[in-house]
Each structure stands twice: as C-alpha cells, then as structure tokens.
Amino acid sequence: MAFIDVKNKKGTADKEPPAGYDSWLDFWEKKKGKKATQCEVMRCNGSPDIGGHVIKVGEGSKEYILPMCSACNNKPDDEVFKAWDTDLVPVQ
C-alpha cells in the first residue's frame, strides 16, 4: 500500500451513480465490501459524507471514487492531496 497524489475531478456534481447504487458512497461501499467509516483523505478524520470523484495526479482523467467529508470534497480542483491507492475505486 502506498499514498498517492490525487485531486478532485471537475464537473461531477450532477453525475449519477450506476444503476443499482443509491449514491457514489454506496457504490464505493459495495465495490469494497465494507462500510466507509471516515474521510479517506490523509490527515482528515471527518465523516464520509459522500463518495467524491478524484483523479490520480499524472494519470490523466481516469475517475475514481473515494469516501470524503464535504470539506475535502470542496477543495479546489487544482489542490493536490494524498490518499491510499487501495482506497480508490475506479468508475467504469
């Protein structure tokens, strides 16, 4: 496991989760097979309010879902933060 650099992805606020999922957080929980217990941004212990859309820095535009608190989800799109690589779930 390793920490990686990620950023919030622009333009995803109105994006609906795939059929069969109540929310993006529900999508993450079902794909990971566990309940989200905290914001997964490094050094944040906030509650996981949403499944935030992030991209890996340097990887292009491939989207991932990460449990995040509202404050971390509202970071500017150009602000880089760290998360565990294993906590990211790809959006297909």
Locations of regions flagged by a protein language model:
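"Short basic amphipathic alpha-helical interaction patches in structured regions
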Residues: V54-V57, L66, F81-L88
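Short, charged surface segments at domain edges that flank catalytic/cofactor-binding sites
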Residues: I4-K35
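Short cysteine-rich clusters marking metal-coordination/redox-active sites
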Residues: A36-M42, C69-C72
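N-terminal soluble segments of membrane proteins
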Residues: M1, Q38-R43, D85-L88
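Active-site or metal-binding loop neighborhoods of secreted/extracellular toxin and effector enzymes
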Residues: I4, K75-Q92
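Short beta-strand-alpha-helix junction that forms the catalytic/metal-binding core
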Residues: E59-P76
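Flanking scaffold residues of small Cys/His-coordinated metal-binding clusters
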Residues: K34-C39, G60-Y64
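Histidine-centered nuclease catalytic patch
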Residues: N45-Y64
